[in-house]
C-alpha cells in the first residue's frame, strides 16, 4: 500500500519527505511522532521499507470500516489510559525480532492548530526496556488536510521530517519513571523543533 499512498500523497497533499537518510533499514526501532490526523501512520510509512506495527487506540480498532483496515495494515490495540501489559509484551517481542513499532506519544491527536499536547512516557519506556533507539518524526500540515470534525480529508500540504536517531539513556541511580519522563520531554522537544 505504500506506493499507492505515496502517489495519493503527492497528488492530493504535495507530500514532502525530509531526512529519509535517518531511517534505519534494520534492527529494532520505535518510530515516535506527533499526531495531527488519521493520515499520519500511512504518510509516515511511505519511505520506510520494512514491516511496521502500530500501537493504536483500542476504541478505533472497533470502528466498522476504519478498524478493520487498521488491523489489516498492522495495528495492535492499546489502552491509552493506564497500563496495557499485553500491548507492551507484544511490542517487546516484535522489537527483539528486529521489527519497527510506531507510537504516537501524545496518546491521540494533538491540538486542532497542529501544536502538540504533553507526551506520555510509554514510547521511551518501551525503548529503554527493549534497548532500541527511537526515530523521532515531525508531521506538519496534516491537521489542515484532515481537520477534526471533517469526515474525509481535503487537499493541503503535508511535510514529514525524519530526525536523527534518538537514544534514550537512563542516568546512574535515576528512577526509571523519572528517566522516562525526562527523556520523553527531550523527545517532544526534538519533534516540536520542526513544527
What do these predicted regions represent?
Residues 10-11, 23-82, 90:
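Catalytic core of membrane glycerolipid acyltransferases/transacylases, capturing the structured
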Residues 1-9:
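N-terminal nucleotide/polyanion-binding subdomain common to many enzyme families
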Residues 4-5, 72-78, 108-109:
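Short, basic, glycine/proline-bearing loop/turn elements
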Residues 10-18, 82, 142-144:
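Short gly/ser/thr-rich secondary-structure transition/capping motifs
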Residues 86-195:
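Non-catalytic C-terminal accessory region of glycerolipid acyltransferases
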Residues 14-17, 75, 160:
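Generic structural signal for residues in well-ordered beta-strands
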Residues 8-10, 70, 94, 126-127:
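A generic structural signal for well-ordered alpha-helical segments
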